[in-house]
Amino acid sequence: MNNRIINLDDIISNDEYGNIRSSKRKEMIEFKKFRRLDVGPVASLYFESRDTMIYQIQEMAYVEKITREELGEELASYNPLVPNGRELTATMMIEIDDPLRRKNFLSRLGGIEEKVKIVISGYEIYADYEKDVDRTSSEGKASAVHFLHFKFTDELIKAFKNKDNIIQIGIDHEAYGHLSIVSDRVREELAKEFI
């Protein structure tokens, strides 16, 4: 059985969560500090883990007053984003505060979810993206949120962990081409997701 799967037993009641919510939020902010990478001026990748997904479920249940009986749907939605030990998963967000500017910018980014990659020593791992919801409209407008999976082989996991290798994360979309270097601290944090 996959011990990375989130079960109902992993989620505490809304009352219990309400008592620790403030401290849990501070803990998560610290935990996520080295799991975020900006790629260019408006795209950010937030790398997920079992803990970040449990936190998301707890927050959703608390804010929306979801009962334990109703949590099955949330678990089904969030479990695919828990890294399986041979991948990294990320939520990519296009973050533009001004609504008009955001709308215009997203209208040029159709298919961006197909253009996100991790580069290790020249080898490119393009993201698989969640296909259950169409993230690009028929008019070519991209969503501001994308859920990505980067699948690794044993050799690529070893290369990722090797501090002598430079790791980059990039987007090679014609309207948004950017590349960022992964710091050693971020690499160290993300490497914990591999079994």
Feature map (PLM): residue ranges:
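Long, contiguous binding/interaction regions
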Residues: 1-87, 95-195
